[in-house]
């Protein structure tokens, strides 16, 4: 039987790229006027099945982005990608954000917008159909997408759950 491909991920061993999804400016009203702060949501990935997201908050934009990248590297997950797409359809929710992802044939491309596209690009998914429903808040859409990708199960996971070998799963 095969060994479990999903093992503990060490971000230092991966060649991670970063992608900034959204920057938000916040204001706190104080006696002397307004004090501005920033938060940034960042997605990191190696384009080969590893992706993570992070939120950074600071008084300066660059500091918020740096904190977001640091946080994202702590939350990297592994996603099974088969022939450039996901193994099966996924529907995920986080808050009011809902994301539907469907596998697609090679050559279809990455049909996704905004935050969903950023996450799937960083994960290395080449062909997928997506639809974002409900809230379009980038924070919740990113979280819904990543939670959906965490729920993806490949043939190995299915065989382990059913207590059968991979050969039995493929032969029916």
Curated annotation (Swiss-Prot):
Pfam family, one: Ribosomal_S5_C
Keywords per UniProt: Ribonucleoprotein, Ribosomal protein, RNA-binding, rRNA-binding
PROSITE patterns the record matches: RIBOSOMAL_S5, S5_DSRBD
InterPro entries named among the record's database cross-references: Ribosomal_Su5_D2-typ_SF, Ribosomal_uS5, Ribosomal_uS5_bac-type, Ribosomal_uS5_C, Ribosomal_uS5_N, Ribosomal_uS5_N_CS, Ribsml_uS5_D2-typ_fold_subgr
Gene Ontology molecular function, alphabetical: rRNA binding; structural constituent of ribosome
Superkingdom in the source lineage: Bacteria
Domain annotation S5 DRBM: ranges: 16-79
Keyword rRNA-binding: yes
GO biological-process terms attached to the record: translation
CC annotations in GO: small ribosomal subunit
Function noted in UniProt: With S4 and S12 plays an important role in translational accuracy.
Subunit structure: Part of the 30S ribosomal subunit. Contacts proteins S4 and S8.
Domain notes: The N-terminal domain interacts with the head of the 30S subunit; the C-terminal domain interacts with the body and contacts protein S4. The interaction surface between S4 and S5 is involved in control of translational fidelity.
Family recorded in the similarity comment: Belongs to the universal ribosomal protein uS5 family.
Protein name according to UniProt: Small ribosomal subunit protein uS5
């Amino acid at each position: 039987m095969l060994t479990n491909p999903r093992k503990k991920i060490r971000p230092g061993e991966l060649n991670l790229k970063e992608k900034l999804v959204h920057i938000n400016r916040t204001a706190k009203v104080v006696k002397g006027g307004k004090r501005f702060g920033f938060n940034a949501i960042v997605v990191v990935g190696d384009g080969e099945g590893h992706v993570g997201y992070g939120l950074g908050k600071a008084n300066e934009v660059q500091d918020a982005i740096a904190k977001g990248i640091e946080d994202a590297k702590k939350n990297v997950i592994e996603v099974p990608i088969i022939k450039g797409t996901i193994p099966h359809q996924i529907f995920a929710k986080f808050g009011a954000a809902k994301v539907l992802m469907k596998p697609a044939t090679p050559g279809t491309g990455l049909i996704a917008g905004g935050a969903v596209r950023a996450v799937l690009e960083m994960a290395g998914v080449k062909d997928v159909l997506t639809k974002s429903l409900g809230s379009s808040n980038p924070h919740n859409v990113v979280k819904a997408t990543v939670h959906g990708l965490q729920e993806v199960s490949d043939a190995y996971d299915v065989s382990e759950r059913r207590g059968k070998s991979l050969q039995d799963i493929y032969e029916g």
